[in-house]
Curated annotation (Swiss-Prot):
Keyword Cell division: no
Pfam families hit by this protein: Ribosomal_L29
Organism whose genome encodes this protein: Edwardsiella ictaluri (strain 93-146)
InterPro entries in alphabetical order: Ribosomal_protein_uL29, Ribosomal_uL29, Ribosomal_uL29_CS, Ribosomal_uL29_sf
One Gene Ontology term, aspect cellular component: cytosolic large ribosomal subunit
GO biological process: translation
Keywords, in A-Z order: Ribonucleoprotein, Ribosomal protein
Chain's gene name: rpmC
Database matches in HAMAP family: Ribosomal_uL29
Family note: Belongs to the universal ribosomal protein uL29 family.
UniProt-recorded name of the protein: Large ribosomal subunit protein uL29
CDD domains reported in the protein's UniProt record: Ribosomal_L29_HIP (cd00427)
Alphabetized GO MF terms: structural constituent of ribosome
């Protein structure tokens, strides 16, 4: 997910995206805790995507 793609989205769409990413992160953490996670790099990607979305939400709130 690129920051440019996210910048084009509205605040509502970003909030929806954030909820989806948080759910995905939760599922990945549960898989990791259970020893079933094969692709551990996905956790890092999702965490960074969450940070991107939160950063853009803060930027839009301040503007």
């Amino acid at each position: 997910m690129k920051a440019n793609e996210l910048r084009e989205k509205s605040v509502e769409e970003l909030n929806t995206e954030l909820l989806n990413l948080l759910r995905e992160e939760f599922n990945l953490r549960m898989q990791a805790a259970g020893g079933q996670l094969q692709q551990s790099h996905l956790l890092k990607q999702v965490r960074r995507n969450i940070a991107r979305v939160k950063t853009l939400l803060n930027e839009k709130a301040g503007a």
